[in-house]
Swiss-Prot record:
Xref: InterPro entries: HMG_box_dom, HMG_box_dom_sf, SRY-related_HMG-box_TF-like
DNA-binding positions: 1-54
Gene Ontology cellular component terms for the protein in this record: nucleus
Cell compartment(s), UniProt: Nucleus
Protein's UniProt name: SRY-related protein CH7
Keyword set, alphabetical order: DNA-binding, Nucleus
GO terms of molecular function: DNA binding
Length: 54
C-alpha cells in the first residue's frame, strides 16, 4: 500500500489496513496471528529480561 501511495500519511494507511483486516475471516487472519506469536516467542528468548517502559 505504501508503494502504491507514497504520499499517503501513516495514519491513513493504518486506517485502511485496519478496515481490510476487519473484513478477513479468522482462517485468513490465522497465518498472521501465528507468525506474530512465533516472533514474540523468539524475541522473548533472545531478550528474556526486556521490559517495555514507555
Amino acid at each position: 500500500m505504501a508503494l502504491e501511495n507514497p504520499k499517503m500519511h501513516n495514519s491513513e494507511s493504518s486506517k485502511r489496513l485496519g478496515a481490510e483486516w476487519k473484513l478477513l475471516s479468522e482462517a485468513e487472519k490465522r497465518p498472521f496471528i501465528d507468525e506474530a506469536k512465533r516472533l514474540r516467542a523468539m524475541r522473548m528468548k533472545e531478550y528474556p529480561d526486556y521490559k517495555y517502559r514507555p
